[in-house]
Amino acid sequence: MAKEKFDRSLPHCNVGTIGHVDHGKTTLTAALTRVCSEVFGSARVDFDKIDSAPEEKARGITINTAHVEYNSATRHYAHVDCPGHADYVKNMITGAAQMDGAILVCSAADGPMPQTREHILLSRQVGVPYIVVFLNKADLVDDAELLELVEMEVRDLLSTYDFPGDDTPIIIGSARMALEGKDDNEMGTTAVKKLVETLDSYIPQPERAVDKPFLMPIEDVFSISGRGTVVTGRVERGIVKVQDPLEIVGLRDTTVTTCTGVEMFRKLLDEGRAGENCGVLLRGTKRDDVERGQVLVKPGTVKPHTQFEAEIYVLSKEEGGRHTPFFKGYRPQFYFRTTDVTGSCELPEGVEMVMPGDNVKVSVTLIKPIAMEDGLRFAIREGGRTVGAGVVAKIIA
């Protein structure tokens, strides 16, 4: 059967759920698709389908990033359900990087928890511009004062990480109720409708970087028999059209290829645009020639680099960072876009050590080249744990 063309009539916006494990992110994601299917006619996606990676069943926690889509009155939303569990921060980083706005799900019964804080911090790090809060499980809280207290705590936490806590919209409701089609005290379907209206009004229509040269970080690589190699990711900027020449940059020698097809949500497109999650079919590129962590770019626009100066912030112990200082020659992993690369740090003259909670300028030398430009953000990690954040200030080599 021929694939149907993707409907572009509504403006497109990327959102996603973040928050502590078991606070109801996946339930809310399913509830959003249910309510939007009834009100605006987009497709419904069941909880089990969103929560479907094999490991997730055993532990009841979401591990991989699930993509769903739904429509509001004015927009088409692509929604990622970000993993909540601390072990999967790596996916959280790639997931949250794909958002024009995030829905922070916080249980009204429990209040903010360690991962609530960590995900707000990560959102700040990876540049999520807007956060809307859904105070979930409100049907389990009888005390209005307690709800008010939790709301204040969440607002304080947002302000701590430079989000506008006082002005952030907070919707109070029950995702489970909405998923079951109930609406007692307007906490179910009505609350989720209100959430969608808030997404429409509070998250401005993102200005897409479509006029800049094409760049897409590669998240995954597939081989499709008879058609070739497909790379998937979110187009960071620009447009890719069928027959465009492209370069694959980073981690190894730069290679040249051609786009022979673009698809999104299993539908064929003539082009992929900034802000969209899509698959790009590459001519003459073997499955083993390309890997996650490389980028697909317009030829000649981005170069791979291994040495740069960066301004970094080292998380304090309270923020879940290191408990001890580090010294020159420190070798953590630097997480750029979709992958970790080990690098060593040189400290400025006169600086002997860097304490948790400090910010400092460092010179970094990576063991593999990364497609890089000034202003590129990264996370600093040790054995899977985020210990800092940084931004490329100046490329050296």
Swiss-Prot record:
- Write down what this protein is called: Elongation factor Tu
- Subunit relationships: Monomer.
Gene3D superfamilies referenced in this protein's UniProt entry, alphabetically: P-loop containing nucleotide triphosphate hydrolases, Translation factors
* Family from the record: Belongs to the TRAFAC class translation factor GTPase superfamily. Classic translation factor GTPase family. EF-Tu/EF-1A subfamily.
Keywords carried by this UniProt record: Cytoplasm, Elongation factor, GTP-binding, Hydrolase, Magnesium, Metal-binding, Nucleotide-binding, Protein biosynthesis
Query: What is the scientific name of the source organism?
Result: Pseudomonas syringae pv. tomato (strain ATCC BAA-871 / DC3000)
Where is the protein situated, by its record's location annotation? Answer: Cytoplasm
User: Which parts of the sequence bind GTP?
Assistant: 19-26, 81-85, 136-139
Q: Which Gene Ontology cellular component terms are annotated?
A: cytosol
* Domain tr-type G: from-to ranges: 10-207
Q: Region annotation G1: residue ranges?
A: 19-26
Query: Its function?
Result: GTP hydrolase that promotes the GTP-dependent binding of aminoacyl-tRNA to the A-site of ribosomes during protein biosynthesis.
What CDD domains does the record tag this protein with? EF_Tu (cd01884), EFTU_II (cd03697), EFTU_III (cd03707)
Q: What class of enzyme is it?
A: hydrolase
Q: Which InterPro entries match?
A: EF-Tu_GTP-bd, EF-Tu_GTPase, EFTu-like_2, EFTU_2, G_TR_CS, P-loop_NTPase, Small_GTP-bd, T_Tr_GTP-bd_dom
Which Pfam families does the record associate with it? GTP_EFTU, GTP_EFTU_D2, GTP_EFTU_D3
PROSITE patterns listed in its UniProt record: G_TR_1, G_TR_2
Q: Which reaction does it catalyse?
A: GTP + H2O = GDP + phosphate + H(+)
* SUPFAM superfamilies linked to this entry: EF-Tu/eEF-1alpha/eIF2-gamma C-terminal domain, P-loop containing nucleoside triphosphate hydrolases, Translation proteins
| Region G3: start-end pairs | 81-84
Q: Which NCBIfam families has this protein been placed in?
A: EF-Tu, PRK00049.1, PRK12735.1, PRK12736.1, small_GTP
The annotated region (G2) lies at 60-64
Q: What broad class describes the main subcellular location of this protein?
A: cytoplasm
GO molecular function terms attached to this record? GTP binding; GTPase activity; guanosine tetraphosphate binding; translation elongation factor activity
